[in-house]
Structures are given as structure tokens and as C-alpha cells.
């Protein structure tokens, strides 16, 4: 993408994120977004198919950023969870707006799929404990759904809880499955 398009895309995403913090998704129009971003309608539609497409891309960007690979070791669950929480915390304004608004379902689904993918890479194929008696698909879904619930709880409480404590609490809820 050329620099001009990237600048317009960034302005649209920033404007949309601001609007999501101010009002419900269903009340936001493409007109509101382009007015806030200072771009034309043709520019918007050259980059996004619709407001829903913009929402999906925003959510995807946040989910992708959450799992950015910075060399964090995948063999230490605490380090891995803290890394993801730190990346979500960096985008907490957008996450809070998505969790609280009409985009919450899209955000939850995207994050669940992203975490399931990561869990599939890190959870042993034949885990110990009760997890070993579960179907793999169910186990991965449970781990990811619990993670999404934790992120929602954290956002609903304005990210006030310490990331390390949230990570420890999440793992305390999940680890008994593997003992």
C-alpha cells in the first residue's frame, strides 16, 4: 500500500476508534467516520467495503497485534499470556470500545480464533490430567473462550487489574486441566 493510502487508512481507523469510544456502533455512519478522518467517501470505499468491513479489519488488527511474535518463548505459559495481555493493554482504548459496543461479538470471535490457533501450537497433543480425556477441539475452544472472558472482564474493569495478576489468575483457572 502506498504512503498516501496508508495515511488515509490510519486516519479512518483512528477516527472510527474515537467514534466507537463516544457512541454505539449502530449509530455511527460512514459519513461520521469520513468527517472525523477528513477523507472523502471515495477514499473510504477505496479502502473498505463498508462500516462492517472497517470493524472487521480493526478487530483483526488488534487480534494480530495481540499475538505479535517478538521472540516471546512459547514454552512458558505465564510469559506468553503476559505478552498477549501487554499487547492488548497497548490498544486498550480500542479494546474497551469493542468489548463494550456492538463490535463485541466480532471482537470475541476473532480473539477466540486467534487464541485457539496459538493454543493449537502450544498445547501438547496428548496432555496430562483431565485435558487428556477431552477432545482436542473442545479443549482448545475452552482455553480460548476462557481467555476471551478474561479479556472482557479486564476491559469491563477498565484494565485496572495488574497484567501479571490477571495472567496468573487465568492460568490458575486453566492449569488444573493439565494436572
Indicate where each model-derived feature is located.
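Secondary-structure edge/capping motif, primarily at the C-terminal ends of alpha-helices
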Residues: 69-70, 95-98, 123-126, 154, ...
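Amphipathic alpha-helical segments that line or abut small-molecule/effector binding pockets
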Residues: 75-93, 141, 149, 164, ...
Amino acid at each position: 500500500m502506498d504512503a498516501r493510502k496508508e495515511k488515509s487508512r490510519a486516519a479512518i481507523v483512528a477516527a472510527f476508534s474515537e467514534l466507537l469510544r463516544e457512541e454505539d456502533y449502530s449509530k455511527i455512519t460512514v459519513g461520521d467516520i469520513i468527517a472525523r478522518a477528513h477523507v472523502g467517501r471515495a477514499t473510504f470505499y477505496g479502502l473498505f467495503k463498508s462500516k462492517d468491513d472497517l470493524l472487521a479489519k480493526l478487530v483483526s488488527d488488534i487480534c494480530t497485534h495481540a499475538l505479535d511474535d517478538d521472540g516471546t518463548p512459547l514454552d512458558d505459559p505465564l510469559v506468553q499470556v503476559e505478552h498477549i495481555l501487554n499487547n492488548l493493554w497497548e490498544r486498550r482504548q480500542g479494546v474497551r470500545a469493542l468489548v463494550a459496543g456492538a463490535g463485541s461479538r466480532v471482537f470475541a470471535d476473532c480473539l477466540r480464533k486467534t487464541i485457539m490457533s496459538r493454543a493449537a501450537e502450544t498445547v501438547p497433543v496428548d496432555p496430562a490430567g483431565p485435558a487428556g480425556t477431552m477432545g482436542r477441539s473442545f479443549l482448545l475452544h475452552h482455553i480460548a473462550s476462557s481467555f476471551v472472558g478474561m479479556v472482557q472482564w479486564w476491559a469491563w474493569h477498565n484494565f485496572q487489574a495488574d497484567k501479571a495478576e490477571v495472567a496468573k489468575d487465568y492460568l490458575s483457572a486453566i492449569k488444573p486441566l493439565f494436572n
